Amino acid sequence: MSRLLFIALPLLVLASIPLYLLVLKSPPPMPKLDLEEWWGPPELKQKQDTSIKPFEITFSETMVKELKERIKKRRPFAPPLEGVGFKYGFNSKQLDSWLKYWAEEYPFAERQKFLNQYPHFKTNIQGLNIHFMRITPKVPKDVEIVPLLLLHGWPGSVREFYEAIPHLTAVSRDRNFALEIIAPSLPGYGFSDAAVRPGLAAAEVAVIFKNLMARLGYKQYYVQGGDWGALIGSAMATSFPKEIIGFHSYMALTLSPAATFLEFVGALFPSLIVEPELANRLYPLSEKYSTLLEELGYMHIQATKPDTVGIGLTDSPAGLLAYILEKFSTWTNPDLRSKEDGGLSYRWTKDQLIDNLMLYWSTKSIVTSMRLYAESFSSRHFDLKLDEIQVQVPTWVLQAKHELAYQPPCILKLKYTKLVNASVIEDGGHFLAFELPEIFAKDVLKAIGEFRKLKNVKTEL
């Protein structure tokens, strides 16, 4: 009897798959997003300025002086437990040296100049002044310039792309196109305004960026994103398939019921779902879910009470540094948690990481950046069911070894029906554009080259 059950159970599971997927094949209706929803102060609605203005990043003397004073007047930190590295979070033994560098050695004027090396702009979209960089390469007459909307996530910023931009915009004899980069700060992040009322979630940010690209004159363009950029980019590809002609992501995921079902089927029969050499990226599920549970505590806080924790992070440079840089340690490679210094020098210099901190500190935007979690994990946003609506846009994924979550192509195709390729690399983590800028850029360029072959259309200006 037990032998018969052993044979029958797998057959029953396999037989149920087509039926289950058939039931889920009928997608929910496309939600109607308000393309003109106003997120700024109501009294300014009749006075909107739609011009595009140059912008320059400035670290004022007053702000820098106050920052240094706050660092100097910090309270002593509780000593860490012995031998824990970064397993309990940022190791307080490492904090003093980081804060000393920030206050005494970080070259504020030099880094301000560095951050302004690319052209920055602001324009008002739906009541919010949206900051963005726009980098247009100089090209020969026979090379077409095509636009790429480049989207960051949390706790990153446009700073993640600085090292990749020269590779992305490079002109090559092997390509008949070159990329123009449009890299905005998400609403509530850095130099972009935050909403004044609740409701600005990933789907609504997608509308803002659609309108931004329209303001810049583009009818069609490519989108690339990781972290929140992946979710927003996916929402754009889902909602606006006429405008988005290709989507590249290094964190493309689908959280639909069908995807979850297939993941559990794969737990019983991994070879049905994932290539053997990649099985350890997804299975065993108990291990993967345990890791996610350990790492997603911040998400629960930010999805429920972002303003509370944000008060401390806005007030304390030590708190902000520890909170953000702990993510740059753990999410780059989980093995770095065992290192006493968190392995933060593994990929970056202190200046690179503090540049990113400065975009949060100087703008007091840590609270408003975290509110995106509360809005996007709300029941209202889940009720849009965007994740259950298939993307009809050509999609390309880049899958780093240490990304927080992995899904094989057979699962991704439930959402991204025109999945062109899944590039798998045995290196890199969550901040891939910042970690491995050249590898990242090469993959993006390869993807866009393939997208152009598939559709054989010119981007419309």
Curated annotation (Swiss-Prot):
Provide the topology term for how it sits in the membrane. Single-pass membrane protein
Locate the active site: D227 (nucleophile), Y373 (proton donor), H430 (proton acceptor)
Known EC number(s)? 3.3.2.9
Q: In which tissues is it expressed?
A: Expressed in fat body, foregut and midgut but not in brain, subesophageal ganglia or silk gland of larvae on day 1 of fifth instar.
Q: Does the keyword Hydrolase apply?
A: yes
pH-activity note: Optimum pH is 7.5-8.0. Activity decreases rapidly below pH 7.0 and above pH 9.0.
Q: What sections of the protein cross the membrane?
A: 4-24
List the Pfam families: EHN (PF06441)
The organism's superkingdom is given as Eukaryota
Where found, per UniProt?
Microsome membrane; Endoplasmic reticulum membrane
Q: What do we know about this protein's activity with respect to temperature?
A: Activity increases as temperature increases from 0 to 37 degrees Celsius.
Subunit comment: Homodimer.
Summarizing the function annotation, the protein's role is: Catalyzes juvenile hormone hydrolysis. Degrades juvenile hormone III (JH III) about 3 times and 5 times slower than juvenile hormone I (JH I) and II (JH II), respectively. Degrades cis-stilbene oxide and trans-stilbene oxide about 18 and 43 times slower than JH III, respectively.
The record's comment on protein family reads: Belongs to the peptidase S33 family.
> What name has this protein been given in UniProt?
Juvenile hormone epoxide hydrolase
Organism listed in the record: Bombyx mori (Silk moth)
- What broad taxonomic lineage does this protein's source fall under? Eukaryota, Metazoa, Ecdysozoa, Arthropoda, Hexapoda
